[in-house]
Curated annotation (Swiss-Prot):
PTM info: Phosphorylated on serine residues in the 115 N-terminal amino acids.
Major localization listed first in the record, in broad terms: host cell
Assigned keywords, A-Z: Early protein, Host cytoplasm, Host nucleus, Host-virus interaction, Phosphoprotein, Virion
Compartments where located: Host cytoplasm; Host nucleus; Virion
Protein's name in the database: Phosphoprotein p30
Induction conditions: Expressed in the early phase of the viral replicative cycle.
Annotated function: Modifies the subcellular distribution of heterogeneous nuclear ribonucleoprotein K (HNRNPK) and may contribute to modulate HNRNPK functions related to processing and export of mRNAs during ASFV infection. Necessary for virus internalization.
GO CC term, one of those recorded: host cell cytoplasm
Quaternary structure note: Oligomer. Interacts with host HNRNPK.
Similarity annotation: Belongs to the asfivirus phosphoprotein p30 family.
Length: 200
């Protein structure tokens, strides 16, 4: 319970102080993932679900607060998009309105999305749905190198179930070097990471 309260306090402070800046929000989302990922893995999915419920409660305050900054060029739509990014970075969440994520260093260049953000649904169960074929060869050396770096990053955390390794890999891909990949590139690297981890 202390763990949940700790997250609650930190999330509240971050969202209330940094909502206006896209780069800061995404940066702190990545920081939160780093701070809590080990404890989330050790505590199991029950704790993860509890945190998700907590964050969804906070979500509505974040979206409402965006109206305060509308005069500064910060819209409710941008708040919704950033919330999508935050959940994706923290818990490997997918939404219907997921757009390609941009560099966290670009504060005011947001891609518009005409769809409403739907309820975030966990993709935990589908992580292994699509696996690379045994004959697959890297078509993009840069992406393959990124996959190798991602695997090295995962191994630095010590032993963890393969299930969680993939989650960590996918989240790390989102924020590596502050430049999230395009959706098709992200999927390509994800498959490479799965293949590399299976060889371990």
């Amino acid at each position: 319970m202390d763990f949940i309260l700790n997250i609650s306090v930190k999330m509240e402070v971050i969202f209330k102080t940094d909502l206006r800046s896209s780069s800061q929000v995404v940066f702190h989302a990545g920081s939160l993932y780093t701070w809590f990922s080990i404890e989330i893995i050790n505590s199991g999915r029950i704790v993860t679900t509890a945190i998700k419920t907590l964050l969804n409660t906070v979500k509505y305050d974040i979206v409402r607060s965006a109206r305060v900054y509308a005069g500064q060029g910060y819209t409710e739509q941008q708040a919704q998009e950033e919330w999508n990014m935050i959940l994706h970075v923290l818990f490997e969440e997918e939404t219907e309105s997921s757009a390609s994520l941009e560099s966290i260093h670009e504060k005011n260049d947001h891609e518009k999305n005409d769809h409403e953000i739907d309820e975030c649904t966990s993709s935990f169960e589908t992580l292994f749905e699509q696996e690379p074929s045994s004959t697959e060869t890297p078509k993009n050396a840069k992406l393959y190198a990124l996959a190798q770096k991602t695997v090295q990053h995962i191994e630095q955390y010590g032993k963890a179930p393969d299930f969680n390794k993939i989650i960590r890999a996918h989240n790390f891909i989102q924020t590596i070097h502050g430049t999230p990949l395009k959706e098709e590139e992200k999927e390509e690297v994800r498959l490479m990471v799965i293949k590399l981890l299976k060889k371990k």
